[in-house]
Amino acid sequence: MSYNCCSGNFSSRSFGGYLHYPGCNPYSTALCSPSICQLGSSLYRNCQKTCWEPTSCRKSCYRRRTSMLCSPCQTTCSRSLGFGSSSCHSQGYGSRSCYSLGSGSSGFRFLKYGGCGFPSLSYGSRFCYPNYLASRAWQSSCYRPICGSRFYQFTC
């Protein structure tokens, strides 16, 4: 699974597909190269950087937490997911994630991670978001975005 941040494409062999982020400059590879955005075990060695904001290719730092049973990721926030929304998420054991999805949406939608499993959504969706489980393997959780989302549809 990898993020090609500055090209605006999200790819994953786990479910085979692309998520397109409109407005991302494909020529800004100097700001966020695919090698920096690679997801995997190397992400949790010391403090590396990855990209959660494809439009501007902002780099966010993830620190290793040995006390966490699941993802050692700290809370990160991203903007410009393709339709003018914002997203804040905190990955970790029993953590909570909140999303603001859809054009013109002003509120956050809360979802809970059951332990280190897949989060549940009350409004259902089909866009996939990587989830780091206790098995230390990257897997994808499926969401269905609310009306107005430009995310591509996947079957996960």
Swiss-Prot record:
Keyword Repeat: yes
Listed transmembrane segments: none
Keywords: Keratin, Repeat
InterPro entries named in the record: KRTAP_PMG, TNFR/NGFR_Cys_rich_reg
Region (4 X 10 AA approximate repeats) location: 37-82
CC per GO annotation: cytosol; intermediate filament
Pfam short name (any one): PMG
Sequence repeats: 37-46, 47-56, 57-66, 73-82
Claim: Nucleus is one of the keywords in the record: no
Subunit and partners: Interacts with hair keratins.
Family: Belongs to the PMG family.
Main function: In the hair cortex, hair keratin intermediate filaments are embedded in an interfilamentous matrix, consisting of hair keratin-associated proteins (KRTAP), which are essential for the formation of a rigid and resistant hair shaft through their extensive disulfide bond cross-linking with abundant cysteine residues of hair keratins. The matrix proteins include the high-sulfur and high-glycine-tyrosine keratins.
Protein name: Keratin-associated protein 13-4
